[in-house]
């Protein structure tokens, strides 16, 4: 029989450590909360320095208004804040923080040092270990605050055991800072990672220059600016050209009142505006900043404030769609400046960056079996054979015999083949996708050939994708996809399996990188390959179907359906030619 335990109040340290579990997930969360404090302090120069992806050390320096010596002990108490006085103030916020939880939460699970000074006063240095103030003494310091966080999660080892890799945290910090670069104006940003300058933005750089820095030249070339206001909603941003799209929503940047926000609702509204301009299952790339009345927004939804409730959601959604449709209909002359044009101005020079323009995806395959498909005269077949001969190597022109299967002819999206069972129709796109999937399975990889490319493919990617490819490059090489890094966000593909086209390979690799992570193990990577390959679109208009692929298909049991359930092969029956 269990004994009754008395109800008691938790001590302040335990309360703060529990709160830290909601607010502070990792080093990225620490950087986020501290730079938001800097922004709320009115800083226009913010420097972030990290070691070990922030797991070793985090240092945030700013030139904000600073702390008075007597304010620091109060600020380290939970729910101490200068942002609000009562609950109703939450709905008229002009600050990023308001709960008064971040600083005490971080202090309770780390060894922290705060150096701060207000204008015209001596600085103060305060050392805190596990939420307890160890020392507080005067120090020489200019206006502003420096917060140093060491030994994160040192007193909660269970939390430390769940941390991701340092590389993953570096990636998260980069994404966080890039979002802040886009969301803020007249604020300089600097990030030093492992002793190297990773990001440097001057406060005088304007919005378009910041977009060019984060999103890259390729995005800016044909991008359109938007700045419209209606019904209390202001929409500002840069819209990618309809020809610039991606297989996932990665690359979509959304801000509400200068807060980075994740909103599927807004993303879908933007997608609706592009709907008639994009191939199926492709997503636009954009930077969109919404400015709404404070009373319309509730940011007190998610512990990390990455979501928002919008009071007049449908009105806002309609405004977004209408504004973007109108902008996309603008004459081509109203375009953003390219990076080259920006460099030729007197602005601070920007580094070359990234992003990939993928080719248009062909329409979905929907070939219905029809007896008209076989209504070819001998002359038609002869002409088809001549056309096939003119565009393929000699070894692929003649009728090919093997002990199992004989190639008959190619009819655009399908191939006809014959074996002892009869004549088969082969749906080439589904067949190639299935063979490519089998080639990725390591136990089958020796059956499939890779081809070295005469001119290597260039793949321009985001930093997130670059981390993935640099981490899993060896695995991809083992599977016949030789990929190497030739720039910060540029990769070169030197060889590929023969059954996949160049643009198909690019699309699939981007899908894989978007869904994967640097920490994924080999078993999970295999499952992810299958999942993303199912989503990828293989061209239905491949001009030459290599007959060696047909022999491969028979060698694996001439399956009727692929790994994804798509129809690969069908035996033509006599009943197909009989009148109903």
Curated annotation (Swiss-Prot):
This is DNA mismatch repair protein MutL. Coiled coil: none annotated. SMART domains: DNA_mis_repair, MutL_C. CDD domains: HATPase_MutL-MLH-PMS-like, MutL_Trans. InterPro entries: DNA_mismatch_repair_CS, DNA_mismatch_repair_MutL, DNA_mismatch_S5_2-like, HATPase_C_sf, MutL/Mlh/PMS, MutL/Mlh/Pms-like, MutL_C, MutL_C_regsub. Pfam families: DNA_mis_repair, HATPase_c_3, MutL_C. GO terms for cellular component: mismatch repair complex. One of its GO terms (biological process) is mismatch repair. The gene is mutL. This protein is involved in the repair of mismatches in DNA. It is required for dam-dependent methyl-directed DNA mismatch repair. May act as a 'molecular matchmaker', a protein that promotes the formation of a stable complex between two or more DNA-binding proteins in an ATP-dependent manner without itself being part of a final effector complex. Keywords: DNA damage, DNA repair. GO terms for molecular function: ATP binding; ATP hydrolysis activity; ATP-dependent DNA damage sensor activity; mismatched DNA binding. PROSITE patterns: DNA_MISMATCH_REPAIR_1. It comes from the Bacteria. It comes from Chlamydia pneumoniae. Belongs to the DNA mismatch repair MutL/HexB family.
């Amino acid at each position: 029989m269990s004994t009754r335990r008395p109800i008691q109040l938790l001590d302040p340290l335990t309360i703060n450590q529990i709160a830290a579990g909601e607010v502070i997930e990792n080093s990225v969360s620490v950087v986020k909360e501290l730079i938001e404090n800097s922004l709320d302090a009115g800083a226009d120069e913010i420097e972030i320095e990290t070691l070990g992806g922030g797991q070793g050390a985090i240092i945030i320096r700013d030139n904000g208004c600073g702390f008075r010596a007597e304010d620091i002990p109060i600020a380290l108490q939970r729910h101490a804040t200068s942002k609000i006085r009562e609950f109703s103030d939450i709905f008229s916020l002009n600050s990023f923080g308001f709960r008064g939880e971040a600083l005490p939460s971080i202090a309770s699970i780390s060894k922290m040092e705060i150096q701060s000074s207000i204008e015209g006063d001596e600085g103060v240095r305060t050392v805190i270990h596990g939420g307890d103030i160890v020392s507080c003494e005067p120090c020489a310091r200019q206006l502003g605050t420096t917060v140093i966080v060491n030994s994160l999660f040192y007193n909660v080892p269970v939390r430390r055991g769940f941390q991701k890799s340092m590389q993953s945290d570096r990636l998260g910090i980069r994404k966080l800072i890039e979002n802040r670069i886009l969301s803020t104006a007249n604020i300089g940003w600097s990030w030093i990672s492992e002793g190297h300058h990773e990001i440097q933005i001057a406060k005088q750089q304007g919005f378009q220059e910041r977009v060019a820095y984060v999103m890259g030249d390729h995005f800016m070339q044909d991008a359109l600016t938007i700045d419209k206001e209606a019904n209390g909603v202001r929409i500002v941003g840069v819209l990618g050209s309809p020809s610039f799209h991606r297989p996932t929503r990665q690359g979509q940047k959304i801000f509400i009142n200068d807060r980075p926000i994740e909103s599927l609702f807004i993303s879908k509204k933007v997608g609706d505006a592009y709907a008639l301009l994009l191939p199926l299952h492709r997503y636009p790339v954009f930077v969109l900043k919404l400015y709404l009345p404070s009373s319309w927004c509730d940011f007190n939804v998610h512990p990390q404030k990455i979501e928002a409730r919008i009071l007049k959601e449908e009105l806002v959604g309609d405004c977004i769609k209408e504004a973007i449709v109108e902008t996309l209909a603008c004459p081509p002359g109203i375009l953003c400046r390219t990076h080259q044009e920006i460099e030729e101005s007197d602005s601070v020079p920007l580094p070359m960056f990234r992003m990939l323009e993928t080719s248009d995806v062909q329409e979905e395959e929907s070939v219905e079996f029809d007896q008209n498909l076989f209504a070819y005269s001998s002359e038609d077949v002869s002409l088809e054979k001549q056309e096939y001969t003119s565009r393929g190597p000699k070894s692929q022109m003649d009728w090919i015999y093997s002990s199992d299967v004989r190639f008959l002819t190619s009819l655009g999206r399908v191939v006809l083949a014959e074996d002892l069972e009869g004549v088969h129709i082969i749906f080439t796109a589904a067949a190639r996708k299935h063979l490519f999937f089998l080639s990725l399975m390591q136990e089958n990889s020796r059956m499939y050939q890779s081809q070295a490319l005469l001119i290597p493919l260039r793949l321009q990617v985001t930093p997130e994708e670059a981390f993935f490819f640099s981490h899993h490059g060896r695995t991809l090489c083992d599977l016949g996809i030789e990929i190497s890094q030739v720039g910060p966000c540029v990769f070169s593909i030197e060889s590929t399996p023969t059954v996949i086209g160049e643009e198909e390979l690019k699309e699939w690799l981007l899908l894989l990188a978007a869904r994967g992570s640097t920490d994924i193990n080999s078993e999970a990577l295999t499952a992810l390959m299958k999942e993303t390959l199912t989503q990828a679109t293989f061209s239905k208009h491949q001009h030459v179907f290599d007959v060696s692929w047909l022999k491969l298909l028979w060698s694996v049991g001439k399956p009727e359906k692929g790994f994804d359930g798509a129809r690969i092969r069908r035996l033509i029956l006599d009943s197909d030619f009989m009148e109903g």
